[in-house]
Amino acid sequence: FPENIFRNVSVPGKDVEHIIKDSRVAAVTITGSTPVGRSVAKVAGQYLKKTVLELGGSDPYIILEDADIDKAVNACINGRILNAGQSCISAKRIIATKFVYHSILDRFKEILPKKIMGDPRDNVDIGPMVSLSARDEVHMQVTNSIDSGASLILGGFIPKLKGAFYPITLLAGVKPGMVAFDEEIFGPVLSLIMAENEEEAIALANNTPFGLGAAIFTKDIEKGEIIAKTRIHAG
């Protein structure tokens, strides 16, 4: 680009309003948490600036009875540990029908311990989180969920490593009312949820204030597309 066409300015939160209200700023876009998005939208609305918000998500990955278990499990793992789980559309809530729930849990227990955590410059599967405070927030959410009745299957501790590392964590038996279900966990935590059937799986997927992304695993492509387009409140 020619000089001064595009400029990246890093500022603390207290200076955001000063920038947004400047007459030279025509529009505002933000990718971040819901609380930050709310505050930016408030300021942008006050000064009548066009606004695009891409905020948090608690993305459901629904695994139906006829799904290919291995493909579904691998997709969930890859979709969750990418960038140490710090992706807005990562696989945050894994909702499996009762018929396949235990098979999926067994596959997670088999595969996840083999994943290597370490320096991302090395041949590893997962690196550190963005900051110690972000890591501590995730750990607090995990601990809170366990205290509420979720079963800790893997991970869930702060490792003795230099840096903001958090291990791949698997929670099972997650239910509405638990932090792992109700909130966005922005880190490498897989929350496994059991649904009695397809209808309950869809209801659980939609039982959230978030609506960023979702995925459905089934061998029936036509049914999957119908559910995705007409019944899942995301996207």
Regions found by a protein language model. Name each.
Residues 22, 55-56, 87-89, 122-123, ...:
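Short glycine-enriched loop/turn motifs at secondary-structure junctions
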Residues 16-20, 73, 199-202:
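Short hydrophobic/charged patches on amphipathic alpha-helices used for structural packing
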Residues 27, 33-175:
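ALDH superfamily catalytic-core signature
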Residues 12-15, 57, 196-198:
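Short helix-initiation/N-cap motifs at beta->coil->alpha
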Residues 9-11, 31, 215-217:
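Structural motif
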Residues 1-16:
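PLP-dependent aminotransferase-like
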Residues 25, 62, 158, 165-235:
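Conserved C-terminal structural/oligomerization subdomain of aldehyde/semialdehyde dehydrogenase
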